[in-house]
Structures are given as structure tokens and as C-alpha cells.
Amino acid sequence: MIGIIGAMEEEVTILKNKLTQLSEISVAHVKFYTGILKDREVVITQSGIGKVNAAISTTLLINKFKPDIIINTGSAGALDESLNVGDVLISDDVKYHDADATAFGYEYGQVPQMPVAFQSSKPLIEKVSQVVQQQQLTAKVGLIVSGDSFIGSVEQRQKIKKAFPNAMAVEMEATAIAQTCYQFNVPFVVVRAVSDLANGEAEMSFEAFLEKAAVSSSQTVEALVSQL
């Protein structure tokens, strides 16, 4: 069983509509869609936006469906200036950009008693990298950071880049999903696409290009599923 998590309806609808033998179940107000995608059993959920929603949905998915792996799909804001709208983002590490327990000796972004970063499954990273090469898509593997704010100003962007110079993208759920997978020992990877450049024009760009990002990330996830 492959688990696929997206925060927003636009981020999961394309994949959900491709499921055969579709079945829907609701647990604690979270909807799960099971079915067959590319001859593989999958379960898709729309988690809702933000870290708490993401962690709850991931926990429910793992407990109810016992997935072998989890893929987080959707959109993100680019922090790497070489990235453009529609480019595919593949996580190697994910971190929180809004966690601060440095007063107790932890690194900025590290939750107490948790790793500094949550590492994606290397075999899954390799698989996704092969997929994007086959599809001739522009993609980047790197650090994705998460927090409970939509990054829509130059000041916010600069603050994150100062704390995490190597971060390529920012969004609101991936690290919470990764932490949950870490605690349940479920391999994961984040496969998202750029919807905006996390700057003063981010809100307008996000609204205009969310669909493009959703198509790009969904196509990549579908191709990945076919090779798992």
C-alpha cells in the first residue's frame, strides 16, 4: 500500500480522479480515498493545511492503512533563485523553519528530542530522480523547510534564507508528515512543484499557478507509483 498526502483539494484531485476501484472512508473528519493507481494499491488523503492537520492525517493514515511508504505531494514556494514555477522539488532533508529551542542547546529548527532534520528515503529519492529524467522535467533535490505561515513577503523569505541558506523551498506540511513517518518508521519522500517564489508577489502567483504546480507534482507522483 502506498500512502499519498496532499494538503489542498487541488493537490490531490488529479490523482484521486485516476483511481480505479475507488472507495472513500472518513476518520475523524479526514477523508481517505483508496483504490488502484498504475496497478498499485494506494490511499490518498487531503490533510488540510498546516503542521497539525498534516500530522493528524498522517497518523490516521498509518494506523488505519499500514502503508509501506508515504509520498507528500503538492505545491511549495521556491527559495532557490534558480527554480521556476512548475519545477519539481524532491526532498532529501526536511526541517521546521519556525521551531526554536536553541535556549536548551538544540539547533534552530530542531524539535527537542527529535533529529536536526528528517531524511527522506534514499531509494525513493533515486526513484523520483529517475522518473523526472524520463519525463524530461526540471527538478531539484534538496532541503525543504516547513512552518505554519504562508511565506508571501521578501522579509519572511530573507529570514528563512538566513537561517537555512541551503533551503530550496518552503511550505506548510512536509516536515510534520516526515516527523510522523520517522516516529512510525515509515519511509517517505516529498514530491512537490513550485507554485510561487515566496516573495512579495507570492499570493498572486500561488493563486495563478497552483493548478500548474498540482499537475506537475501529480504527474511525477503517478509516474513514481508506476515504478514502485
Swiss-Prot record:
Catalytic residue list: E11 (proton acceptor), D196 (proton donor)
GO molecular-function terms, A-Z: adenosylhomocysteine nucleosidase activity; methylthioadenosine nucleosidase activity
Reaction(s) this enzyme catalyzes, per UniProt: S-adenosyl-L-homocysteine + H2O = S-(5-deoxy-D-ribos-5-yl)-L-homocysteine + adenine; S-methyl-5'-thioadenosine + H2O = 5-(methylsulfanyl)-D-ribose + adenine; 5'-deoxyadenosine + H2O = 5-deoxy-D-ribose + adenine
A single BP term in Gene Ontology: L-methionine salvage from methylthioadenosine
Amino acids binding substrate: G77, I151, M172, E173
GO terms for cellular component: cytosol
Record pathway: Amino-acid biosynthesis; L-methionine biosynthesis via salvage pathway; S-methyl-5-thio-alpha-D-ribose 1-phosphate from S-methyl-5'-thioadenosine (hydrolase route): step 1/2
Signal peptide annotation: none
Keyword list, A-Z: Amino-acid biosynthesis, Hydrolase, Methionine biosynthesis
Superkingdom field: Bacteria
Keyword presence, Zinc: no
Keyword Hydrolase: yes
Task performed by this protein: Catalyzes the irreversible cleavage of the glycosidic bond in both 5'-methylthioadenosine (MTA) and S-adenosylhomocysteine (SAH/AdoHcy) to adenine and the corresponding thioribose, 5'-methylthioribose and S-ribosylhomocysteine, respectively. Also cleaves 5'-deoxyadenosine, a toxic by-product of radical S-adenosylmethionine (SAM) enzymes, into 5-deoxyribose and adenine.
Annotated NCBIfam families: MTA_SAH-Nsdase (TIGR01704), PRK05584.1 (NF004079)
Family named by the database record: Belongs to the PNP/UDP phosphorylase family. MtnN subfamily.
Protein name: 5'-methylthioadenosine/S-adenosylhomocysteine nucleosidase
Organism (species): Staphylococcus aureus (strain MRSA252)
Upper classification of the organism: Bacteria, Bacillati, Bacillota, Bacilli, Bacillales
